[in-house]
Amino acid sequence: MMLEHVLVLSAYLFSIGIYGLITSRNMVRALMCLELILNAVNINLVTFSDLFDSRQLKGDIFSIFVIAIAAAEAAIGPAIVSSIYRNRKSTRINQSNLLNK
């Protein structure tokens, strides 16, 4: 019974993250939605790691690596957004065409 609740929560977080990532026009909101997706993946990793083999910590250790990557993204992402804002005076995704040239 608990497994279904955790998987529904994870699917709900993942769906909100994907929906927000697709529909957001603001870079900060897109970064927040990406964090939701990574957290949903972490919940699944820990849940299935405990379900299949509770003696080994492979899923837990892998989720720690995903958390470290998310922390790096949370540190570098806003710096990139603030740099784009200083140059373009906007954080809208559709107005950012720095890589098109």
From Swiss-Prot:
Matching Pfam families, A to Z?
Oxidored_q2
Q: Which domain of life is it from?
A: Eukaryota
Which positions, given as ranges, span the membrane? 2-22, 32-52, 61-81
What are the protein's GO molecular function terms? oxidoreductase activity, acting on NAD(P)H, quinone or similar compound as acceptor; quinone binding
Key words, A-Z = Chloroplast, Membrane, NAD, NADP, Plastid, Plastoquinone, Quinone, Thylakoid, Translocase, Transmembrane, Transmembrane helix, Transport
Topology class, membrane: Multi-pass membrane protein
List localization entries. Answer: Plastid, Chloroplast thylakoid membrane
Q: Which Gene3D superfamilies match?
A: 1.10.287.3510
Keyword Lipid biosynthesis attributed: no
What sort of enzyme, by top EC class, is this? translocase
Reaction catalysed by this enzyme: a plastoquinone + NADH + (n+1) H(+)(in) = a plastoquinol + NAD(+) + n H(+)(out); a plastoquinone + NADPH + (n+1) H(+)(in) = a plastoquinol + NADP(+) + n H(+)(out)
Q: Name the principal localization, coarsely classed.
A: plastid
| GO terms classed as biological process | ATP synthesis coupled electron transport; photosynthesis, light reaction
Spell out the subunit comment.
NDH is composed of at least 16 different subunits, 5 of which are encoded in the nucleus.
State the HAMAP family in the record: NDH1_NuoK
NCBIfam families the UniProt entry points to: PRK05715.1-2 (NF004320), PRK05715.1-4 (NF004322)
Protein name, per record? NAD(P)H-quinone oxidoreductase subunit 4L, chloroplastic
Instruction: Point out the gene that encodes the protein.
Output: ndhE
